[in-house]
Amino acid sequence: VTISIVGSTSQLASSITTMPTHAAGHLLLCLAYNDGSSTAVTLPSGWVERYGIAVGGVGYIRVGYRYAQSSSETSGTWTNADQLFMLSISSGANTLVFPNFISSNTGTATTINFAAQTAATFQTGADDQALISWVVSRNSTNTLTAPSGLTAQQSATDSANYVSQVCFQASRTTIWASTNITVATSALYRSLMLSLVESPVYGASGGGGLILPGGFNGGFN
């Protein structure tokens, strides 16, 4: 069954007022950004950190996730965050989706690069795989486009300092290669490419499957 995004929301705040539609078992993925400071964004209780890194000395991004226990989960407060993307992601029966590998890049240019992922990170035994890209450009006049193969899911801007976008591709069957997009004005950016993997829950389909969260075969670039 294909990994799919059930819903997404964006808010210029440290918490989400209206969560995207979700149900028990869905992966809730939060992409949090602190603009104007390299102070780390702090995760709320119950969320697991997947990645965190400064954007030069003028920003900080944090990726966190949890699995919904009901259809009425809340975001909690992501301390120091100025902007949040929240995604609800589903998979097939008796499976879970987990965030596997992140490649990341940064620079100051009109060319924004989404760094390649490596052969060792591609889970050939997975039921399904998908990709999520996220980029922050510190010039609010720039127009962001989706990297090749992905579709824009949600965008945000504070209309003064930055613009941000998250994109998605379902049913990914090949390793992500280094890919560029261009913007009109040279600006500091931070880009991420996150692979999502679907795997059977142990014991749900006769055993097998990949290692589930807490011991997954993932990593960073």
What does each model-identified segment do?
Residues 1-220:
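Primarily extracytoplasmic/secreted proteins
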